């Protein structure tokens, strides 16, 4: 029944993807690029075993479906599962590969791959082993940018709580150590004080004579404190006063000259 269903699905996809009209009634890619669609479905193996004593069944089906629409994209899926009842458990695994090749020789090849795995459980000892299942681990590298570049790799496989706690402790230790280093450097920079050298002049043992001491004492100038006036008066009134005095003096000089000239004229008349 499953094989018939797969064949019907492949025929429906083939009918929908082909073009009948000359103008094109199906999907048209960029500028009517000729696209070749090939769909293949193959049923690999189908096994059915039954045991009358314990009524166990084991079904192993492997299907490989590939859909390629060149030059746009192609997809391939591989699925394998086994089912045994009632004395064994069920295991299911699937892998999907999606790749996008070069489009019209203009864009670079960008392959995308993703794998989703479910853990396979142990079946009973009397059930037959299924076919080999594809497995792939995904590793992702992450850059931790907390004051220092630290690389961590995590895998998609399940791990225990102990490993998770170890990773958490390692990351917190690295963060705290870098933080403590930065705080130490900051405190050291703040504690630095500027020291200026100074010279202390002291008389040596050879300069204890009175002559040398008198020379040093003569060079010293007596300290005179500056006496500040009690009242600081504003001196802006001096400028108009000087102007008035100068005008009065000029008037006196001119009057004197005028009197002298009048007397001189009277004398010659």
From Swiss-Prot:
KW Glycoprotein (keyword) present:
yes
Q: Polar residues composition bias: which ranges?
A: 103-112
Q: Which residues are glycosylated?
A: 53, 58, 74, 78, 137, 161, 170, 191
Arranged from A to Z, the UniProt key words for this protein are: Glycoprotein
Q: Where is the composition biased (Low complexity)?
A: 76-87, 113-136
The highest taxon in the source lineage is: Viruses
Task: Spell out the protein name for this chain.
Answer: Gene 51 glycoprotein
Q: Where does the record place the region Disordered? A: 67-87, 103-137
